A protein has these predicted regions:
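Active-site neighborhoods and metal-handling regions in enzymes and metal-associated proteins
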Residues: 1-253
């Protein structure tokens, strides 16, 4: 069931979103050659704990870390470890924080040093596809209006959207109804109502939309080995413009 948040609950979600966005900004600043993905995870864990919050991802369905760090052809759910970031990598970080009974969730993909023009274009198209969808995150629109706008922008730029993984409602639980696909035709799904909180997260492949699940049970890669990018924010539906509960100011490239 889709839950509409009260004014008090929205304030709590703003608090969770602020911490989550700050954790993303910290992770972004750490994306540099020579840094290990485990170092990013450790720093994000400590930052979230220092704010009095709990990392949403840690032990979620058995996930072993506080942040997902996915590099190059890894689309999502990369487990941090000994991997050393290299010049030219693109690095996706996905972060969640839980405080006051509510979650925040956001992600972004960032260049490690100098990257190719095509890699940078993939990152920017993925970011902009989120904002194309955001235009329809308004009371009275249909959920699939967001989905269709994301897909149209991505495909117009020659990339493809992942279909097996989608955005979601968010609140007291990390994943709540409704699912928010990054593809579809406009005019379908539930109408958006003020008080809804959703995480919209385009996952975009440079080549084919096909994916591969890795043996670790978490990491998802592109089937063709080409790069992927990911961008996400937690959104509040209002009577007017949507409110981004995870401030995107320090999340863009």
């Amino acid at each position: 069931m889709i839950t509409l948040k009260s004014a008090h609950e929205i304030e709590l979600m703003r608090r969770a979103g602020k911490i989550t966005a700050a954790a993303r900004a910290l992770a972004r600043d750490m994306v540099k050659p020579g840094v290990t993905t485990a170092q990013i995870d450790k720093a994000v864990f400590q930052f979230i704990k220092d704010q009095g919050a709990t990392p949403s991802f840690l032990h979620y369905n058995g996930y072993p870390a506080s942040v997902c760090v996915s590099v190059n052809d890894e689309i999502i759910h990369g487990i941090p470890g000994k991997r050393v970031l290299q010049e030219g990598d693109i690095v996706s970080v996905d972060v969640g924080a839980f405080i006051g009974g509510f979650h925040g969730d956001c992600a972004g993909t960032y260049p490690c040093g100098q990257v190719s023009d095509e890699a940078l274009r993939l990152i920017r198209v993925t970011q902009q596809s989120f904002f194309e969808g955001l235009k329809y995150a308004r009371e009275g629109c249909r959920l699939s209006d967001i989905s269709a706008a994301v897909q149209a922008y991505v495909e117009a730029n020659g990339f493809s959207v992942v279909r097996e993984y989608v955005g979601h409602g968010i609140g007291r639980k990390m994943h709540e109804p409704p699912e928010v696909p990054n593809y579809g035709k406009p005019g379908h799904g539930p109408r958006l109502l003020r008080g809804m909180t959703i995480a919209v997260e385009p996952m975009v492949n440079a080549g084919s939309a096909a994916i591969l699940q890795m043996p670790d049970g978490w990491t998802v890669k592109t089937a063709d080995g080409k790069n992927a990018a990911h961008y996400e924010n937690t959104i509040l539906i209002t009577a007017g413009e949507p409110e981004l509960l995870t401030d995107p100011e320090k999340s863009l490239v």
